[in-house]
């Protein structure tokens, strides 16, 4: 599931301050940004706040956005920077327990119990990843960005993106195996676009 780019006319109008055009952009990207942030921070309320802050920063920075890069690349770069700022601030505060059990797993509604348990186990394994691995994996598998877009968004090389996604998937698979969770192997195309 790749994210589409906003219509250039809508983007240009939003850059000139057209509130309707900006609302169109927010509606198109609010859910993917929120889902990404939620999986990184593990707290629905904080994810909602951060998503709003991301779009405030996007609104403020939109007049300076140039079409040299894709809008989604820039949007997730803004998102990454805001989340990293928040994670650094959280590190300086007394520790609080983040529990993935409070987060409804994607696609778990109306699924058999075993499938829901497997999804929960996957998200627990993802939650245990380092922030760098988690960001790359979520941008690819949840948001649907290409490897190139991830490299641009995270400001890292394409090789680093490939390694982080490979390593993240390897660590998730190892965690699932340790927990005795059987997950069917799905052949993945070697697409790096």
Segments (PLM) and residue ranges:
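DNA-recognition helix of helix-turn-helix
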Residues: 80, 84, 88, 133, ...
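Internal acidic/polar
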Residues: 3-7, 85, 93-119, 146, ...
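Arg/Lys-rich amphipathic alpha helix in sigma70-family domain 2
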Residues: 60-67, 77-98, 115, 167, ...
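Short amphipathic alpha helix immediately N-terminal
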Residues: 26, 128-147, 153
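Short, charged helix-capping/linker segments at alpha-helix termini
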Residues: 3, 13-24, 34-53, 158
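Structural recognition of an alpha-helix C-terminal capping motif at a helix-to-coil junction
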Residues: 35, 49-56, 69-81
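C-terminal edge and immediately downstream basic/flexible tail or linker adjoining helix-turn-helix-like DNA-binding
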Residues: 2-3, 13, 95-98, 123-124, ...
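Sigma70-family region 2
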Residues: 15-16, 39-44, 53-70, 89-91
